[in-house]
Amino acid sequence: MTRRYWNINLEEMMEAGVHFGHGTRKWNPKMEPYISAKRKGIHITNLTRTARFLSEACDLVFDAGSRGKQFLIVGTKNKAADSVAWAAIRARCHYVNKKWLGGMLTNWSTTETRLHKFRDLRMEQKTGRLNRLPKRDAAMLKRQLSRLQTYLGGIKYMTGLPDIVIIIDQHEEYTALRECITLGIPTICLIDTNCDPDLADISIPANDDAISSIRLILNKLVFAICEGRSSYIRNP
């Protein structure tokens, strides 16, 4: 895999608060190689390591994007949800930003059935057929459509398992990460100082609580995906 330059700037990361970890009492000893200092009771992440692994992740997604691979971005906590949706839409990726439904990947046949139902209901609403049903039936189906939109709206065009999954916050999305590990799907995971760096294929040590930090990491990955996709379009 060719290494590229992704304009990953340490000063920019500091301004975004990427280096701020969790309190020193809430840490995983496996994160010690990625921590540079303790300050006012919190761990400080070594941004040189962050830059290295973020660059590796950008190389990976560029390469995958240039070969037409499919991505899924997962981040369901409030601080990540909007950034995840924005990044995924910008890079034409699938995403989950509300709630991870257990078995979403490992029980793909059930997810596929739900997606078919979701698409059918969307079509019925679009054509006006829902409004021609008895009020009680229409109301029930509209509630069902609303729930499906909330939980599956970001994967409505997904027709199979993703090739790479990008995860924001290992603790919050542990179920999603375990499903990827079970299925052998490569993962890129943003990890804070309380996480296990050994679980993902590429772990990016960074603040997973600050919106500015999450957005910066996603910006770099999305740019690399878009660059890869444009390369794929030029050289199919």
From Swiss-Prot:
Q: Where in the cell is it found?
A: Plastid, Chloroplast
Pfam families the record matches: Ribosomal_S2
UniProt KW Ribonucleoprotein keyword: yes
Which UniProt key words apply to this protein?
Answer: Chloroplast, Plastid, Ribonucleoprotein, Ribosomal protein
Q: Which InterPro entries match?
A: Ribosomal_uS2, Ribosomal_uS2_bac/mit/plastid, Ribosomal_uS2_CS, Ribosomal_uS2_flav_dom_sf
Record GO terms (molecular function): structural constituent of ribosome
GO BP annotations listed = translation
The keyword rRNA-binding is annotated on this UniProt entry: no
The cross-references to PROSITE patterns, in alphabetical order and at most eight, read: RIBOSOMAL_S2_1, RIBOSOMAL_S2_2
Q: One GO cellular component term, please give it.
A: chloroplast
Which PANTHER family does the record cross-reference, listed alphabetically? Answer: 30S RIBOSOMAL PROTEIN S2 PROKARYOTIC AND ORGANELLAR, SMALL RIBOSOMAL SUBUNIT PROTEIN US2M
The text of the family note is: Belongs to the universal ribosomal protein uS2 family.
Q: What HAMAP family does the database record attribute to this sequence?
A: Ribosomal_uS2_B (MF_00291_B)
Question: What is the name attached to this protein's record?
Answer: Small ribosomal subunit protein uS2c
Which taxonomic lineage is given here? Answer: Eukaryota, Viridiplantae, Streptophyta, Embryophyta, Tracheophyta
Which gene specifies this protein's sequence? Answer: rps2
